[in-house]
């Protein structure tokens, strides 16, 4: 099978790039920036008519599979290319799969929009264009889902676990951490949630994440 991932690490494409790197897959990284019209070419729009990265193509025995949406791409990679035996980030059973789906949908619904606002107005945008009031309002809203995350991590820690839905790093952790990392520029917010901060550091310090961030350089 040939797996191709379109996108750049400095985008939501980091999610499937990280997943593929975590699994040690040989894949083609098609560098596609969201700037400069690269996602608006006829060739790219044939892959993803939304004109967004990431998109992936997977040549399988059943035919070519095309997936877009970053969480869908990450979950697909884990299921299609993971061992499914508890030895990697893929789900080992239906319980883990259900939890991974739950966390992926949850983080997109409850955190991503406000996390992106924090990232943009605390770090990514030119300083003259940042609006502290927007960042502060987003941080206030984020305290609600962060309390949920902190509570789950507390329950897992009581069992001697360091991750969300199994006693190992899974695609569920990858999905949530890939959004949580956008909050790190927030001054002081993460100090209110020490278990979440420690878990996030464990996830982002993984060699596969560090390697994925360097792809295309």
Task: Report residues per predicted region.
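GST-like domain detector, emphasizing the conserved glutathione-binding G-site
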Residues: 1-132
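Generic structural signal for individual residues within well-ordered alpha-helical segments
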Residues: 45, 98-101, 175, 197, ...
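Residue-level recognition of oxygen-bearing side chains
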Residues: 72, 195, 208
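A generic structural-conservation signal
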Residues: 29, 192, 212-213
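C-terminal helix/juxtamembrane-tail motif
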Residues: 216-217
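GST-like fold's C-terminal all-alpha helical module
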Residues: 95, 104-201, 205
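Active-site-flanking alpha-helical
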Residues: 78, 179-180, 213
